[in-house]
């Protein structure tokens, strides 16, 4: 990335992250059966240390989870430098918040996504390449 264009990359990353977070957590809470469509075919999810890869396995995993209600507190994002992902527009998105799964107490969580831009003739769609979810249990 040329330094003169860096602000453009940051603005693009922030817009993409904001749109993505709205779509992702609405889909997770209300249309979970569609959630795996947000992932690349080769994407990997690490959920509290347990890895799940591929859209079919992701779909099965998400369907197993109890219904949820996510509340987002913090969203941070940054473009990933071209040297790390040559010829691929990539964004790191970090989310902190709380979630209540049906039958469980509300818990804090941290989630990190690597998103990549998938261009088609009509538009650009951001897909999840990597997803890492962790419950945050604070020491007392």
Curated annotation (Swiss-Prot):
GO CC terms of this entry: cytoplasm; cytosol; nuclear pore; nuclear pore central transport channel; nuclear RNA export factor complex; nuclear speck; nucleoplasm; nucleus
InterPro entries for the chain: NTF2, NTF2-like_dom_sf, NTF2_dom, Nuclear_transport_factor_2_euk
N-acetylalanine PTM positions: 2
Keywords: Acetylation, Cytoplasm, Nucleus, Protein transport, Transport
Locations listed in the record: Nucleus; Nucleus speckle; Cytoplasm
Biological-process GO terms, alphabetical: mRNA export from nucleus; poly(A)+ mRNA export from nucleus; protein export from nucleus
CDD domains: NTF2 (cd00780)
Keyword Metal-binding (UniProt): no
GO molecular function: small GTPase binding
Main location: nucleus
UniProt keyword Protein transport, yes or no: yes
PANTHER family on file: NUCLEAR TRANSPORT FACTOR 2
Quaternary state and interactors: Heterodimer with NXF1. Forms a complex with RANGAP1, RANBP2/NUP358 and NXF1. Interacts (via NTF2 domain) with NXF1. Stabilizes the NTF2 domain of NXF1 by heterodimerization. The formation of NXF1-NXT1 heterodimers is required for the NXF1-mediated nuclear mRNA export. Preferentially binds Ran-GTP. Associates with NXF2, NXF3 and NXF5. Does not bind nucleoporins (NPC) directly, its association to NPC is mediated by NXF1.
Its biological purpose: Stimulator of protein export for NES-containing proteins. Also plays a role in the nuclear export of U1 snRNA, tRNA, and mRNA. The NXF1-NXT1 heterodimer is involved in the export of HSP70 mRNA in conjunction with ALYREF/THOC4 and THOC5.
Protein's name in the database: NTF2-related export protein 1
UniProt organism field: Homo sapiens
């Amino acid at each position: 990335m040329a330094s003169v264009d860096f602000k453009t990359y940051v603005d693009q990353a922030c817009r993409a992250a904001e749109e993505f977070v709205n779509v992702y957590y609405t889909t997770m809470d209300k249309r979970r059966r569609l959630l795996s469509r947000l992932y690349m075919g080769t994407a990997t999810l690490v959920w509290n240390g347990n890895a799940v890869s591929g859209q079919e396995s992701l779909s099965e995993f998400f369907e197993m989870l109890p219904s949820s209600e996510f509340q987002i507190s913090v969203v941070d994002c940054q473009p990933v430098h071209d040297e790390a992902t040559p010829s691929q527009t990539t964004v790191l998105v970090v989310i902190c918040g709380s979630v209540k799964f049906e039958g469980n107490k509300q818990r804090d969580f941290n989630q990190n996504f690597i998103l990549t831009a998938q261009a088609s003739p009509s538009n650009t769609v951001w897909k999840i390449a990597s997803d890492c979810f962790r419950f945050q249990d604070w020491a007392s």
